[in-house]
């Protein structure tokens, strides 16, 4: 797997989970001898919603809610076969979405 790069993108609603998962991935990759760039924090995506409090009248009375999606980006440069196997066996929390691209 010479001259290849693995790009890992993590998404989660809880920043503690995503930081913990990023640390596990970095430790695993470094243990197998790969070079890691990151984790780089990407901008947090904030979705805001307005909901009517009352089902009938009082149009001006509303609740405001938001969902924050935190993102991290990592590059693993010159991964070995051991690196790929270790990353495949890695168990991450359920609230973290992982996207892996080979470049």
From Swiss-Prot:
GO terms for biological process: translation. InterPro entries: Ribosomal_uS10, Ribosomal_uS10_CS, Ribosomal_uS10_dom, Ribosomal_uS10_dom_sf. Disulfide bonds: none annotated. Gene3D superfamilies: Ribosomal protein S10 domain (3.30.70.600). Transmembrane segments: none annotated. The keyword Ribonucleoprotein applies. Keywords: Ribonucleoprotein, Ribosomal protein. GO terms for molecular function: structural constituent of ribosome; tRNA binding. The keyword Heme does not apply. Part of the 30S ribosomal subunit. Belongs to the universal ribosomal protein uS10 family. This is Small ribosomal subunit protein uS10. It comes from Azoarcus sp. (strain BH72).
């Amino acid at each position: 797997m010479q001259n290849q790069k693995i790009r890992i993108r993590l998404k989660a609603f809880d920043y503690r989970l995503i930081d913990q998962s990023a640390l596990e991935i970095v430790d695993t990759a470094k243990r197998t001898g790969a070079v890691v760039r990151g984790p780089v924090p990407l901008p947090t995506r904030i979705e805001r919603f307005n909901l009517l409090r009352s089902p009938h009248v009082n149009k001006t009375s509303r609740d405001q809610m938001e969902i924050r999606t935190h993102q991290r980006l990592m590059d693993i440069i010159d991964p070995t076969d051991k690196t790929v196997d270790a990353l495949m066996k890695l168990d991450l929390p359920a609230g973290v979405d992982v996207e892996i691209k080979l470049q």
